[in-house]
């Protein structure tokens, strides 16, 4: 039975990925922020979904030692870590000249450096066992830029560079590394943003979706969390053993333009 660590998995995309792995019989290590009771309820719910066991570790993604402990604790519990899904991320939108340096540091730390620390801690075990899967959740913003998102765009571009390097270093050890690059994803957070934008701009929510949120996506449809989760599961499989070092857009045609 294989074991997967998914960071930022107490809500949104990460939770959807964790659920799919749990349903398919993996041991799952959750990580993320939230109310303690709600996190435990989520863990318990996922624990009933499949044959594997689901645990939670509250490592702070800005603390390398805590990330190392996350990996060590999971290895001690399950014997091995087979799959990493670096997903944790935050966002801040501001002009470069007004962008708070502390926000820049936090976004680079959580969205990029935490993935490095996670991979660094797990890589020796993966090399020893001659198997590993690293599946980072990057973004269309790892391939293209948007104004006012300097830190996020820099971090996601950096993630693709990290993934390519991991793919090259891991190739002879049966380790693959790939990045999923979603466009706009339908999550509760985005739904709230739609409502707020509609109110602020005196627009209908439908017009906000097509003319503002999904303007960049030719399909004019949100990416679904389940679609990302399905791709992550496939990339973890033996059938995907020759897919490595890839940035895989799932963005309704955004980056094809």
Predicted region positions:
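Conserved glycine-rich cofactor-binding loop
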Residues: 10-12
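Conserved glycine-rich Rossmann-like NAD(P)H-binding loop of the short-chain dehydrogenase/reductase
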Residues: 24-41
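Substrate-binding pocket helix/loop in short-chain dehydrogenase/reductase
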Residues: 95-96, 103-108, 213
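C-terminal substrate-recognition "lid" of short-chain dehydrogenase/reductases
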Residues: 116-119, 123, 131, 219-250, ...
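Active-site helix of classical SDR
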Residues: 119, 155, 163
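Residue(s) in the substrate-gating loop at a strand-loop-helix junction
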Residues: 139
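Short, small/polar-rich loop/turn modules that mediate ligand/substrate recognition or access, typified
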Residues: 171, 176, 243-245
């Amino acid at each position: 039975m294989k074991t997967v660590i998914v960071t930022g998995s107490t809500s949104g995309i990460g939770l959807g990925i964790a659920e799919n792995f749990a349903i398919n019989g993996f041991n799952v290590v959750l990580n993320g922020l939230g109310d303690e009771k709600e996190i435990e309820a989520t863990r318990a719910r996922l624990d009933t979904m499949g044959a594997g066991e689901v645990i939670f570790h509250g490592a702070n993604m800005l603390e390398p030692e805590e990330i190392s402990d996350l990996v060590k604790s999971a290895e001690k519990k399950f014997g091995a870590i087979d799959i990493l899904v670096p997903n944790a991320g935050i966002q801040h939108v501001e002009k470069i000249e007004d962008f708070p340096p502390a926000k820049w540091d936090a976004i680079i730390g959580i969205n990029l450096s935490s993935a490095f620390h996670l991979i660094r801690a797990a890589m020796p075990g993966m090399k020893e066992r001659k198997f590993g899967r690293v599946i980072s959740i990057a973004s269309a913003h790892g391939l293209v830029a948007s104004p006012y998102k300097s830190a996020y765009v820099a971090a996601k571009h950096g993630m693709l560079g990290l993934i390519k390097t991991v793919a090259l270093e891991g190739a002879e050890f049966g380790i693959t590394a790939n990045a999923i690059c979603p466009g706009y994803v339908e999550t509760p957070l985005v739904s709230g943003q739609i409502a707020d934008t509609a109110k602020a701009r005196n627009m209908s929510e439908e017009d906000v979706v097509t003319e503002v949120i999904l303007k960049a996506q030719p399909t004019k449809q949100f990416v679904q969390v389940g679609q990302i989760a399905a791709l992550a599961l496939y990339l973890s499989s033996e059938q995907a053993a020759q897919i490595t070092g890839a940035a895989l857009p799932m963005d309704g045609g955004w980056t094809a333009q």
